[in-house]
């Protein structure tokens, strides 16, 4: 990944935000996630209505770095981030310093409105499950509340219902994931063109709009996105270095540590957290004083005159 390309991609994204501040509320940021070979790049091209991301059929990744593309849809400016092999069991080898994962954060800052988990219809495998675990490790457990599952090879349904397929599948892991994602699923035929292609995009972006309404306009965020915003005006290399370090710290923590950190960050972001914290502190101090007073009274009674 060239440093200049990284800087250009990030400058393009931030430039779009600066040039569109008056309509920032209508920007929709999407991240394509999932295992290698599931069809992320082809799905991204279908969403954009143009061949923006390099794509070909195969089991190995042809995407080498996070890349962005954009389009207008209705009154929204849609930004799509395509991702390379950063969600597999080999990610510690393919991205040892977490630079590409940091790059993904920077290109989608201040946070995505939806993560699109791309998987092939009828082929939700152990690799897909591993990719979901990597997504959770990278972004946090709550990220599934912002996730839509996109099945490629819609043509294999042969006119059947996607919801019937999901409901009747014997793949327990898939059923559980769909439930965790609130039942948000759609299917794409990435060879479709014209009105058929646009109908697929309409359905998907309609789900994204539903997520935006559900979350009252809020995009997904965590402590890494917060850092990316703090460093927004730093140089691109410094920004990437700092964010990559934070991502590395997040993914290398034990699961319970990551969960605790996410809950603490969410609690601190709550407008009522300081009041609750103060109440807990005062309550603890009062309890300590009561216990201490009781022990003192008991001690006095023991040594007092008969």
From Swiss-Prot:
Sequence similarity: Belongs to the TRAFAC class TrmE-Era-EngA-EngB-Septin-like GTPase superfamily. AIG1/Toc34/Toc159-like paraseptin GTPase family. IAN subfamily.
Major localisation: endoplasmic reticulum
Keyword Protein biosynthesis appears in the UniProt entry: no
Compartments (UniProt record): Endoplasmic reticulum membrane; Golgi apparatus membrane
Protein name: GTPase IMAP family member 1
Region (Disordered): 1-21
Function: May regulate lymphocyte survival. Required for normal levels of mature T-lymphocytes and mature B-cells.
PROSITE patterns: G_AIG1 (PS51720)
Tissue expression pattern: Predominantly expressed in the spleen and to a lesser extent in the lymph nodes. Detected in T-cells.
Membrane topology, as annotated: Single-pass type IV membrane protein
Chain spans, region G3: 82-85
Stretches assigned to the Cytoplasmic side: 1-272
């Amino acid at each position: 990944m060239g440093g200049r390309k990284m800087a250009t991609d990030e400058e393009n994204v931030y430039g779009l935000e600066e040039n569109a501040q008056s309509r920032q509320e209508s920007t929709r940021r999407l991240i394509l996630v999932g295992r290698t070979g599931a069809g992320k790049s082809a799905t991204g091209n279908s969403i954009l209505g143009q061949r923006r991301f390099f794509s070909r059929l195969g089991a190995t990744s042809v995407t080498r770095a996070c890349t962005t593309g954009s389009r207008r849809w209705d009154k929204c400016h849609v930004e799509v981030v395509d991702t390379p092999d950063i969600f597999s069991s080999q990610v510690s080898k393919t991205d040892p310093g977490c630079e590409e994962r940091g790059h993904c954060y920077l290109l989608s800052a201040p946070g995505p409105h939806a993560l699109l988990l791309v998987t092939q219809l009828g082929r939700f495998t152990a690799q897909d499950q591993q990719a979901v675990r990597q997504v959770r490790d990278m972004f946090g457990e709550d990220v599934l509340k912002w996730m839509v599952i996109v099945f490629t090879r819609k043509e294999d349904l042969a006119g059947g219902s996607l919801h019937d397929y999901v409901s009747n599948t014997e793949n327990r892991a898939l059923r559980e994931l769909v439930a965790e994602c609130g039942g948000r699923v759609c299917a794409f035929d990435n060879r479709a063109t014209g009105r058929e292609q646009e109908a697929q995009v309409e359905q998907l972006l309609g789900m994204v709009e539903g997520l935006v309404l559900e979350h009252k306009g809020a995009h997904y965020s965590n402590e890494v996105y917060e850092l990316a915003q703090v460093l927004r005006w730093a140089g691109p290399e410094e920004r990437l270095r700092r964010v990559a370090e934070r991502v590395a710290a997040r993914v290398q923590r034990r699961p319970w540590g990551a969960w605790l950190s996410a809950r603490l960050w969410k609690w601190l972001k709550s407008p009522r957290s300081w009041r609750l914290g103060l109440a807990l502190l005062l309550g603890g101090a009062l309890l300590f004083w009561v216990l201490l007073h009781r022990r003192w009274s008991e001690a006095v009674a023991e040594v007092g005159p008969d």
